[in-house]
């Protein structure tokens, strides 16, 4: 009898065990589609990014013009750029929904998978930040200046660290060059971390909406979930193309159509929408080091989720108190996102401070209390 190549070839069997014969819970919902959507986002960004890099010049005197040249003179250059810029937004939409799913259904109890996922989020944020600097518009330059300057809040070594990162005494040509190098490198780091993420996931298998073991009821990934994923791909890619073709600048900042000028500060310096919640938390503390620590904590607090889980049930499916808190947290993050886009004046300052406080309170205090309370109410 001939050997089945799919199951025996050293490379094909890895693909087979990850995408074809993978035993998968039979009841996972569309919330489990975002992992594969993130994979498609990464592939799209690497392909469009590579095509853009072929026409880009990492030099302060040429960067802005080279991006304009790509849009005007390169075949479909405008489309490639718009897909790449808006693809980043879709990447963040998918990752935030993916993390939200993990929080709701208790997926963070797969500790290794969860921790690698947070490192992936941090790497993605770094990639998006250095990428935003490359067109060398006003918001690129001032965004880079403001965010890199935050490192100067680190006691004793801060200023040295910032000048080392800049490669000089301000954001200038060396900064742009190294940011381009990092922006080219980091997506491949993300791809590598994704494989680690999947390796840990396949050690335990996927969680499911009920939060109970599903070993007794597994189905093969192909064809059931391959076809379901393809539907997700079609919906996401058609949305991305629609955004890139009909309103490519909807999510961008008009300030970035002006070439970078170190002598003129834009009236409102703000990052892209996907960083606004963290930016609002940073601004809500009237102390530089305190703000930087709060900014870091806003993401790093995710590492504590497995430790803060007090419920005897894994998922929130049958936990109404935690569900209410979860959706309050979502609303809270939307408020922070809105506040991050507003000028620093009343009433936005106090709203931002209250939203920042409630963000940490819900995660660190109220979720664990709700878990204990639900155990008592449900007599578990």
Curated annotation (Swiss-Prot):
Alphabetized GO MF terms: metal ion binding; ubiquinol-cytochrome-c reductase activity
Keywords for this protein: Electron transport, Heme, Iron, Membrane, Metal-binding, Mitochondrion, Mitochondrion inner membrane, Respiratory chain, Transmembrane, Transmembrane helix, Transport, Ubiquinone
Cofactor(s) this protein requires: heme b
Binding site for heme b b566: 98, 197
Cofactor note as given: Binds 2 heme b groups non-covalently.
Any one Pfam family match given in the protein's UniProt record, by short name: Cytochrom_B_C
Annotated transmembrane regions: 34-54, 78-99, 114-134, 179-199, 227-247, 289-309, 321-341, 348-368
A Gene Ontology cellular-component term: respiratory chain complex III
Main location (coarse class): mitochondrion
Lipid bilayer topology: Multi-pass membrane protein
Binding site for a ubiquinone: 202
UniProt: heme b b562 binding residues: 84, 183
A Gene Ontology BP annotation from the UniProt entry: mitochondrial electron transport, ubiquinol to cytochrome c
Compartments, record wording: Mitochondrion inner membrane
Additional comment: Heme 1 (or BL or b562) is low-potential and absorbs at about 562 nm, and heme 2 (or BH or b566) is high-potential and absorbs at about 566 nm.
Quaternary organization: The cytochrome bc1 complex contains 11 subunits: 3 respiratory subunits (MT-CYB, CYC1 and UQCRFS1), 2 core proteins (UQCRC1 and UQCRC2) and 6 low-molecular weight proteins (UQCRH/QCR6, UQCRB/QCR7, UQCRQ/QCR8, UQCR10/QCR9, UQCR11/QCR10 and a cleavage product of UQCRFS1). This cytochrome bc1 complex then forms a dimer.
Family the UniProt entry places it in: Belongs to the cytochrome b family.
Function recorded in the entry: Component of the ubiquinol-cytochrome c reductase complex (complex III or cytochrome b-c1 complex) that is part of the mitochondrial respiratory chain. The b-c1 complex mediates electron transfer from ubiquinol to cytochrome c. Contributes to the generation of a proton gradient across the mitochondrial membrane that is then used for ATP synthesis.
Protein name, per record: Cytochrome b
Lineage: Eukaryota, Metazoa, Chordata, Craniata, Vertebrata
């Amino acid at each position: 009898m001939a050997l089945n190549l799919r199951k025996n070839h050293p490379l094909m069997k890895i693909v087979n065990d990850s995408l074809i014969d993978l035993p998968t819970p039979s009841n996972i919902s569309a919330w489990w589609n975002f992992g594969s959507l993130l994979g498609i986002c990464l592939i799209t960004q690497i392909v469009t990014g590579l095509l853009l890099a072929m026409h880009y010049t990492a030099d302060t005197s040429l960067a802005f013009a080279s991006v304009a040249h790509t849009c005007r003179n390169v075949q479909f250059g405008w489309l490639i750029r718009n897909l790449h810029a808006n693809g980043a937004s879709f990447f963040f939409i998918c990752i935030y929904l993916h993390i939200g799913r993990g929080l709701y259904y208790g997926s963070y109890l797969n500790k290794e998978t969860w921790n690698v996922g947070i490192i992936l989020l941090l790497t993605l944020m770094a990639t998006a930040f250095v990428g935003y600097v490359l067109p060398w518009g006003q918001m690129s330059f001032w965004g880079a200046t403001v965010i890199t300057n935050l490192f100067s809040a680190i006691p004793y070594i801060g200023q040295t660290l910032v000048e080392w990162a800049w490669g000089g005494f301000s954001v200038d040509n060396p900064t742009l060059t190294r940011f381009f190098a990092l922006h080219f490198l980091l997506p491949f780091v993300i791809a590598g971390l994704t494989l680690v993420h999947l390796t840990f996931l396949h050690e335990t298998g996927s969680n499911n909406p009920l939060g109970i073991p599903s070993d007794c009821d597994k189905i093969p990934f192909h064809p059931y979930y391959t076809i379901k994923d393809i539907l997700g791909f079609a919906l996401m890619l058609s949305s991305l193309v629609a955004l890139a073709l009909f309103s490519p600048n909807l999510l961008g900042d008009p300030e970035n159509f002006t070439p970078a000028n170190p002598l003129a500060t834009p009236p409102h310096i703000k990052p892209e929408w996907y960083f606004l919640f963290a930016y609002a938390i940073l601004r809500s503390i009237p102390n530089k080091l305190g703000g930087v620590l709060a900014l870091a904590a806003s993401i790093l607090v995710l590492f504590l989720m497995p430790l803060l889980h007090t419920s005897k049930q894994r998922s929130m499916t049958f936990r109404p108190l935690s569900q209410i808190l979860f959706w309050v947290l979502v609303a809270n993050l939307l408020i922070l996102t809105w506040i991050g886009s507003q000028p620093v004046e009343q009433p936005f300052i106090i709203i931002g401070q209250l939203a920042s406080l409630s963000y940490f309170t819900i995660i660190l205090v109220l979720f664990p209390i709700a878990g204990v309370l639900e155990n008592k109410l449900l007599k578990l």
